[in-house]
Structures are given as structure tokens and as C-alpha cells.
Amino acid sequence: MSFSRETVAKSFLWKLFERFSVQIIQFVVTIVLARLIVPSEYGIISLIAIFIQLCEVIIEGGLNTALVQKKDADNKDFSTIFFFSVGVSFLLYWVMFFAAIPIARFYSQPTLVPVIRILSVNLLFYAINSIQRAYVSKHMLFGKLFYSSFFSVILSGIIGITMAYKGFGVYALVAQAISNQLFTTIIMAFTVRWRPDFVFSGERFKPLFGYGWKIFGTSFIITLFVNARKLVIGKFFQPATLAFYEKGDQIPSLVMSNIFTSIQAILFPVFSEDQDDRPKIKSMMKRSTKMSCLVIYPLLMGLIVVAEPLVSLLLTDKWLPAVPFIRILCISYFFMPITLSNWEAIKAMGYSDITLKLEILKKVIDVLILVVSVFYGVYAIAWGAVLYNFICLFINLWPNKKLLDYSIREQISAAVPSLLISLVMGAAIYWMHILPISRLALLSSQIVLGAIVYISICYLTKEESFMYLLGLLKNNYKRILFKRS
């Protein structure tokens, strides 16, 4: 199976549209819920989400990635992994059921017990949906993925908001999470129409597991240590403090996850198909890095500048303690676009052992930074994330210096134009906070001026990725007009 440039472009646009539309709706739902539910109850869900995410990584086991990476994967492969994942999800549910009490004791939060036991039901739905998503990614069916994500987030949002309005508190968040995963799984069953055969092949499972366990190890380590700061904050600080940190990470993460997930979903299957054509992979990596930075950097810079009026208007002043975390963690995210396509290329070329070894090295560094920073307070923990991502930038870029003859300097230079233009944009809108205008007027003015400044500079300087994207949009527009005529 080989994907044309047009197929890749359409798939990327579908995936990006799906992520943005879903996240915009989810963001609106979050705003409403944040106004109805106090930060401390959000903190309770944040504590539980850490353990649920770890269980989800175990359920996937890197096997869904292995299905996408395998060139000739058929329904026997998908069915084998499907039944394995479902079996693991049942086992993990009971692990979480009995672990609920010790987890609650660890955090001195007895209210966690029933919430953990109810929310863990999501693991079964996640197991089914993980294989559905692997099938979609393998066959570039991202248009179908849009419908399940779009309608499920609307329906679950209605349920969550209704329950929050009725005073259910933390259980409104639980109901929203479960219904979202349930609706996604059900709708995808109708739109994708993939069905497992009643078969489990040990012969097929062995090579998939041989590749997947390394991806699993990498993903588990990443998930554990991404949440390590939240675990520490949840243990040594109040749930409300964790909620502020979580919200501070959630807002820039909204920007990152939409674009990263879209790019990641497209790059991995494409890289896997061309895994033997190293010059082509290098060229695509360079293009994807530039495109990622073109979109992500101005959004992160904008968030740093407008964080205070944004939080005050959308979430109310009770969430203003999240503003410093938003700004600090936005800086942390600046290093990540450079490594995304790099990481996907290494996995697609079959070097999952390299990703595992490097993750172990990085997490040793992360532990050292976290252990030191925890003694200096919650803001030091956040700045520790910045230091960690800066160090990881060079660790992540090192392998492709040898594998693809792609130097670290060359990889970093791909991000420089977008970074410089974003800094100019940030400086142009920062001064506006001194104007004697309302927060709504300030926020609106900064967004409009920022967009004008960024786009104008990109156009006047003929920034490569901007002109490429502009040309792509023009060609698609002409094609649509031609079809209509």
C-alpha cells in the first residue's frame, strides 16, 4: 500500500479538522464545567486520570502501533490484537477496583475510591477503540474518524454540563469521560465497519509483540514521567493546586495535541511505507518540522502574552492562579515540535529499541530534576519541565544524525524562522496590556493584531513553509471552483 501526496494531504486536513473541531467543542464544554465545578474537584479527577492513562498505555501495549507499522497487516493481525487488548482491559479494571483504597489512602482523599471504580469502566471501551483507531490510521480513513469524535464530544458534553448544573460535582466529570469514550466506540463501529474475526493467532502475535513491547516501554515511561509532576504535586500540595497546574498545562496542551496528533497520525504510516527510502524520510521530516513550527510557535507565543485576560474571561478569576503555569509550560512546549517528526521517523524505520533506550536515559534526568525542584515549590516543578525538555531536545535529535545524516544544527535551524517571527509578534502585542480598555477588548485586540503581524511578516519575508501552505490552499480552492463550474 502506497499513499499519494494528495491522499496524505487530505488525510492530514481531515485529521487536523477532526482534532480542532473536537477540541474547540471540548474547550467550550470545559469552560462551562470550570464555571460550575470548583478547582478542588477538578484536582480529584486529575489524580485519577494519571492512573487511568497508565492503564491505557498497558492496554495498547505498543501493539496498535505495531499494526500500523506492519506493511501487510490483515484482519487476522487486527483480530489477534483486539482480543488481547480486551482481555488486558478486563484484568486492569479489577486491578484498579482493588487498588482504589490504597490510592485514596496515599493521597489522603477517601472520596477517590468510588470515583476510581466507576471511571475505570472506561478501560474496556478504550481497548476496543484503540484497535478501531489503528485500523483508521493504517488505511488513512481519517474522514470517518471525524464523525465519531465530533458527535461523541457533543453528546458527552451535554451529559457532563447537565449533571454539573444539577450539582453532581466530580461525578459530572466522570460521566462526561465515560460517555465520551462509549459514544466514540459505538459510532466508529458504524462508520468504519471493521469487525474482528473470532481468532487469536500466536504466530501473528509474536512478531507484533516483538516490535510493540519496545513502543509500550517507551510510551509507559513517557506517560509515567509526564504525570510524575502531577503525582508529586497531588501528594505534597492541595488538590486545588494540582487543578491549577493541570489547567495551566491543559490550555497549551490543547494547541499542541491538536496539531501533534494530526501530524503524528499521518507521518507514522507514511514513514512506515517509505522506511527504506532514507533521503525521502529526511526530506519529509524537514518539511513536517517547518510546518509544525509555523503553526505552533505563534499560538504558544500568543498564549504567553494573553494568558491572564484569557483565563479571567473564560474560566473566571477563581482560575487566575493557573496563569503562571500556562506561561511556564508554553515555554516548555517550544522545544517539542522539532522532535516530533524525528521521533516518528525512528519508530517507522523499525528502531523501537533506540526510542526505549533514549527514553530511559531521559527519564533518569527527569527524576533528578524533579527530586531537586520539589524542595523549591510548585513553580520550581514547572520550571523543571522547561529544563527537562531543553535537555531532551538534543537527546532526541541525536539518532537521526547517524541514521539519516541529518545534523542537529540542521534540524534546529528548521524551526528558527517561525521562532523569530513569533517573537516579533509577541513583542508587538505585549505592550497592549497598558491600554485602559476592558479585558474582552484587550484579548480581542491582541488576537487580531497578533494574527495580522504574524501573517504579514511571513508573507513579506516569503517564509518557505507559509508560501508552501498558501500555494496548497490556492490549488485546492481552484480545484473546488473548477469542479463546481
Predicted regions and their residues:
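Hydrophobic alpha-helical transmembrane segments
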Residues: 113-120, 148-193, 207-211, 218, ...
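Helix-loop junctions and terminal segments of transmembrane helices
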Residues: 56-75, 137-138, 248, 252-296, ...
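Membrane-proximal transmembrane or re-entrant/amphipathic helices at the cytosolic face
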Residues: 398-401, 406-408, 415, 427-485
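Signature of the first transmembrane helix
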Residues: 3-63, 84-102, 117-120, 152-161, ...
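N-terminal membrane topogenesis motif
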Residues: 1-27, 65-83, 112, 143-144, ...
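Interhelical loop/hinge segments that connect adjacent transmembrane helices in multipass membrane
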Residues: 1-4, 8, 143, 186-227, ...
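Transmembrane helical elements of multi-pass membrane transporters/channels
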Residues: 11-22, 26, 173-180, 184, ...
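Membrane-interface junctions at transmembrane-helix termini in multi-pass inner-membrane proteins
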Residues: 5-9, 66-75, 125-148, 166, ...
